[in-house]
Amino acid sequence: MTNIRKTHPLMKIVNNAFIDLPTPSNISSWWNFGSLLGICLILQILTGLFLAMHYTSDTMTAFSSVTHICRDVNYGWIIRYMHANGASMFFICLFMHIGRGLYYGSYTFLETWNIGVILLLATMATAFMGYVLPWGQMSFWGATVITNLLSAIPYIGTNLVEWIWGGFSVDKATLTRFFAFHFILPFIITALAMVHLLFLHETGSNNPTGIPSDTDKIPFHPYYTIKDILGAMLLILVLMLLVLFTPDLLGDPDNYTPANPLNTPPHIKPEWYFLFAYAILRSIPNKLGGVLALVLSILILVLVPFLHTSKQRSMMFRPISQCMFWILVADLLTLTWIGGQPVEHPYIIIGQLASIMYFLIILVMMPVASTIENNLLKW
């Protein structure tokens, strides 16, 4: 008798994706982040669902409803902080996952990579709208500042902003629609993640060497299921350390003050995972220029496969490219730090230099480094 997991229409899909999947025998822990992102997504949907049961998307009661969740709902505080810090864990895993893709040349799987970029944009949109929902000071002013950026679009900008707001300022209509979109987007992300996986399984996984591994494959289960469980345990350990010991470490104290349209906080800044893009936005004195740089800082990922000039796929055996990659990582950390600093000397010039470096490394230095390596190897 044939095993049911290989014949049942639904079980067959699961089997081919998670059990009998032929996997390269040498993939490292950097390949764990895909499954960790899946765990983060499930965790966010579950905690978010329970939060939505008690949350009210009205400007008068939103802040109070979050307070009510933390004080009066059974285990409401842990659900709320798991959701808030879960978003941070989600982005840590996302950045690691993208970094892995850049380092090992996984971006040569074009469809998988491009859907990944769409997933990143959808996740960023979801996180932004989620940050608005508690209706604290930073929620309100963050929403005002970021949505206002669309007014930089020539001719239709102002109308577009008012259309998104549902009025002439961020108000009740804005909060209600942000809640609706924040609720629906994770399910769209789930569907996109399935398509992401579908395209990945068409080609099979990449591996650290970047060399095709068709001759050396092992089944996903038990080898990588156990490895993923270890990764998941570490993820949950770090998340729960954050939630139970320093739940507000990554948040902004201003968000414990109810939203007040008449009082602007001294430093408006987004959550830490958007600071690098925020620093790039602020480093350009022109509004439209800043918005374009902000959008390009993410969409530049789409260009990466076309900027690949090396004869090798992975950076494993390319020391000059490795240097460029780690300079890029340092540059992104610098931008993240600058994004959280006030707009004054010397932060302005550091931010501008780091922003120029960011685009220069990806568009010029990395392709040049690859060409130099090709010549050194006489390829």
Curated annotation (Swiss-Prot):
Sequence positions that bind heme b b566: H97, H196
Gene: MT-CYB
Cofactor: how and how many bound: Binds 2 heme b groups non-covalently.
Cofactor dependence: heme b
Bilayer topology annotation: Multi-pass membrane protein
Residues that bind a ubiquinone: H201
Cited InterPro entries: Cyt_b/b6_C (IPR005798), Cyt_b/b6_C_sf (IPR036150), Cyt_b/b6_N (IPR005797), Cytb/b6-like_sf (IPR027387), Cytochrome_b (IPR030689), Cytochrome_b_C_euk/bac (IPR048260), Cytochrome_b_N_euk/bac (IPR048259), Di-haem_cyt_TM (IPR016174)
Protein name: Cytochrome b
Transmembrane segments: 33-53, 77-98, 113-133, 178-198, 226-246, 288-308, 320-340, 347-367
Entry GO CC: mitochondrial inner membrane; respiratory chain complex III
Major localisation: mitochondrion
Family: Belongs to the cytochrome b family.
Role of this protein: Component of the ubiquinol-cytochrome c reductase complex (complex III or cytochrome b-c1 complex) that is part of the mitochondrial respiratory chain. The b-c1 complex mediates electron transfer from ubiquinol to cytochrome c. Contributes to the generation of a proton gradient across the mitochondrial membrane that is then used for ATP synthesis.
GO molecular function, one term: ubiquinol-cytochrome-c reductase activity
Note: Heme 1 (or BL or b562) is low-potential and absorbs at about 562 nm, and heme 2 (or BH or b566) is high-potential and absorbs at about 566 nm.
UniProt xrefs under Gene3D superfamilies: Cytochrome Bc1 Complex, Chain C (1.20.810.10)
Swiss-Prot/TrEMBL GO biological process terms: mitochondrial electron transport, ubiquinol to cytochrome c
Keywords, in A-Z order: Electron transport, Heme, Iron, Membrane, Metal-binding, Mitochondrion, Mitochondrion inner membrane, Respiratory chain, Transmembrane, Transmembrane helix, Transport, Ubiquinone
Residues that bind heme b b562: H83, H182
Localization in the cell: Mitochondrion inner membrane
Pfam family, one: Cytochrome_B
Keyword Iron belongs to the record: yes
Assembly and binders: The cytochrome bc1 complex contains 11 subunits: 3 respiratory subunits (MT-CYB, CYC1 and UQCRFS1), 2 core proteins (UQCRC1 and UQCRC2) and 6 low-molecular weight proteins (UQCRH/QCR6, UQCRB/QCR7, UQCRQ/QCR8, UQCR10/QCR9, UQCR11/QCR10 and a cleavage product of UQCRFS1). This cytochrome bc1 complex then forms a dimer.
